[in-house]
Amino acid sequence: MDNMELCEANNVPLTPITFLKRASECYPNRTSIIYGQTRFTWPQTYDRCCRLAASLISLNIAKNDVVSVVAPNTPAIYEMHFAVPMAGAVLNPINTRLDATSITTILRHAQPKILFIHRNFEPLAREILHLLSCDDLQLNLLVIFIDEYNSAKRVSSEELDYESLIQMGEPTSPLVENMFRIQNEQDPISLNYTSGTTADPKGVVISHRGAYLTSLGVIIGWEMSTCPVYLWIFAYVSLQWMDVYMGNSSARGHQCVYEPRNPLDMSHRSGPVHLMTGGSPLPAALVKKVQRLGFQVLHVYGLTEATGPALFCEWQDEWNRLTENQQMELKARQGLGILSVAEVDVKYNETQESVPHDGKTMGEIVMKGNNIMKGYLKNSKATFEAFKHGWLNTGDVGVIHPDGHIEIKDRSKDIIISGGENISSVEVENILYKHPRVFEVAVVAMPHRVWGETPCAFIVLQKGETNKEDDEYKFVAREKELIDYCRENLPHFMCPRKVVFLEELPKNGNGKILKPNLRAITKGLVAEDEANVIS
């Protein structure tokens, strides 16, 4: 049987853009997108994507060309996730919270042929173009504005805009047929830049195959039912969720875009609301608060380099018999690999041996599978480091519990080494989140003359717990209260020796806390016990 060859009939490259074609054929009356008063069916979305792809091809967009987009959650950015790869190109969604300098850095590196930008960001576009014009190497960039659908505002006849491209597109039958026939499933489908909380962002290249299999893995792992309604409250620019909104088309679901200015009313829901959350590890105390609001929480772990969600907390029926607090502790774990993850492990960096499954011994989380990126664009050194020893080295520190579930403990750069002992900043944060005064917390290492490093907690208090007229004595008393609370719930060497109160924590465009900024602040701080030693 080894000599049986693959052929065109039995070897069709995998790509998630086929989800769209199938949805339009199978569910002609099913809603695909709800955006304010705008409604589209799957055939309408399919037609718009085909027209947009045809227009891109007419603009000489070809295989592996990069198309960048800066836009909020709108039907346009959803359509581009299908239409751009249908034209053979690579979509590069850019975070709208980045400033002009950061976006210009990405554009210089990605070298896109087209930049789509929402009309709301027109001043930002002018600043970006000014910065690009100062370069020695000119980027020949076509800028196309996106206006709201059915907007009365239209650009001049000399400018191209998004809706005009769709109207002008002529998707002939042969052209459409070729749109869904990619040459190689390992061809790139998207270029996403990491959030860059610890360094300059890197361009992560994802394949059609990786996006396809991860989409199916997410749908199966989340137990997404048929005809789901998916409410988008996170930016479409994040690869972490690309798999869900592309895969949702295969489940004949539809997308709802949530506008943050409007309160989220859950009073009219007809069934349970399932909430998927990822990013930084979610404290059990926060899971408990969210579930009491009526959500069913699914905790996931993912990263851009793994095409988004990679581990799910796989709920076991016997856990339903546990107390609420015990259940929340289990839900706070990140869990097991999804379908597209072949293997996941936690290993010692020095020996590359697996850590014991005791829920205590920490190591680096590593994984391999069809979900893993192709590599970093134009950065072979970083790609080599990421794939050392035949695994994707995530840079995240975790443990494996006796039941095989993985729990993240920290980023490797956020581990605090005090007197030779490794301290998980996340573990300390989880304890502080249980204190009724604490709204938000981040724990980082601060220098210590005796122990080398010691934990320092930066805390935002709950509303009503502080005001500008509070005197220093009140803050000192609160600091002592929180340190004593940690000493009651943690080994003393893990407890913060300094607490700093802030009105808000510094965050990047994705909402991740910028711990390097906080570590910089600690260089000017002195722990109380250290002050006694110095004196």
From Swiss-Prot:
Keyword list, A-Z: Fatty acid metabolism, Ligase, Lipid metabolism
Domain of life of the organism encoding this protein: Eukaryota
The keyword Lipid metabolism is annotated on this UniProt entry: yes
Membrane-spanning intervals of the chain: none
Enzyme Commission number, as recorded: 6.2.1.-
Lipid metabolism among keywords: yes
SUPFAM superfamilies: Acetyl-CoA synthetase-like
Gene Ontology biological-process annotations: fatty acid metabolic process
GO MF assignments: ligase activity
Protein family: Belongs to the ATP-dependent AMP-binding enzyme family.
Listed PANTHER family: ACYL-ACTIVATING ENZYME, BENZOATE--COA LIGASE, PEROXISOMAL-RELATED
Function description: May act as an acid--thiol ligase that activates carboxylic acids by forming acyl-CoAs.
Protein name: Probable acyl-activating enzyme 22
